[in-house]
Amino acid sequence: MRFRSPCTIFVVVKICIVDIVITYVDGLDPVWQKDYERYTNQPVLEKRFRDWGTLPYLFRGIAVNMPFIRKVHLVVSHYSQVPAWINRDEVNIVLHRDIIPEEFLPTFNSTAIEMFLHRIADLDEEFLYFNDDMYPMLECRAEDFFRDGKGVIGMSSHFWPSNMYKIHCRNSYRAACHGVGRKPGLCFLRPQHICSPMLKSKCEELYDRLREQIHASITRVRSNGNLNQYLYLDYIYLEGKIVNKRQPKKHFSLGVASAKSLCQFIMHPTHQLACINDVQLGEERFVELKKTILYAFNQRFPQKSKFEV
């Protein structure tokens, strides 16, 4: 009699590992305020660095809706900037001095910080960069942000930079074109304003190519000559490593959004992601909106996450 050898079948499952990087400023921190006023000779701008108290809900949204995340890195200027509720066993605290050359410190310019995020120790190849006004509201999958080694985000073309932010976008696109040896045209790219899917190796590659140009663009506070995070995202796109697909997100400007519409969306979201953008507000409206937003977020995400003590 003949006996067939047992056949063993191996199924290879690719596990997508993604990190998140969050930059954060606590404008009420006396240590930070002292540095800001000393190095800029300007009073702290209330709107620019105002704390809405919503950071815990960003972390809760990650815990509930993004279970595929390997590690969260929180980038701050000093340890005094780290909220007391942060669980440091679950959140990697990254100080500016850990990634930014000493010659550019201290910095109060988010675009300067964005030039060096790829230098975070133990950062995964695929990482999402979140501003602290962006929130995952519904269940997300890793494939929503990365597919077959490519980032997924919407890219649009623009002709005229109507404000400083768009000037930074144009600067960044032109520099990215230089990085791939391409002459930029009249238009410039602007990625969708949501969490950015970055590839660490491509960021390192471009930084090595354009180190002098990047360093020359850096200022302590924002100026028209700055580059921003889209330098890297545009380069990744030009290298053929972006799937041009818009993320399902809702954008609110606090200057025009009503308390009712904010509350309704946060408690019953219709999009995976949300950006709630701060603008100059009077004290009365700030207090009203903050109360509404915190109430709604606490209804949406009532349970503490592993990122909190």
Question: What residue ranges belong to the model's regions?
Answer:
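C-terminal catalytic/acceptor-binding lobe
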Residues: R211-V309
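Aromatic-rich, lipid-facing transmembrane alpha helices and their immediate juxtamembrane interface loops
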Residues: F59, L105-N109, R147, G151-H168, ...
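Soluble or luminal CAZymes and related metallo-dependent hydrolases
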Residues: R50-T54, F108-A112, N224-N228
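Active-site-proximal specificity loops/subdomain of glycosyltransferases
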Residues: Q81-D122
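GT-A fold catalytic core of metal-dependent nucleotide-sugar glycosyltransferases
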Residues: S80-Q81, F116-W160
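N-terminal anchoring/stem segment of glycosyltransferases
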Residues: P6-D98, G240-K241, P269, L273-V309
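Long, charge-rich alpha-helical interaction segments
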Residues: V152-S223
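N-terminal cationic-hydrophobic initiation segments that often serve targeting/anchoring roles
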Residues: A63-M66, H118-A121, I236
